[in-house]
């Protein structure tokens, strides 16, 4: 996976867990002037969840937070070349973590507790 690991100087962090399958993702963003300069992630889960989070980091680096927020799990799955139907939910956790990080950035907090 690309861009895997914690980012010490992230100014926006989103964390999401899926209680149904046990997967969890933390997305770390370094945002300057509403542009995502750097992004890393930590995903604990199946290979499809890790691959989806990894490709998502490649897709959003250099984009505005608005452009990144609009990305869909379908776009992530397409970028991977498709996912089996029963694994489509795995592409959602990275998107949700990214959106939570962007929401935290917009709200002026690095990480929220909800």
Residue ranges with predicted function:
Residues 21, 43-52, 90:
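Short, thiol/selenol-centered motifs that function as redox-active sites or metal-ligating centers
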Residues 1-8, 12-15, 24, 32, ...:
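C-terminal binding/interaction regions
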Residues 38-42:
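Beta-strand scaffold of nucleotide-dependent catalytic cores
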Residues 48-63:
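Alpha-helical support elements that line or immediately flank enzyme active sites
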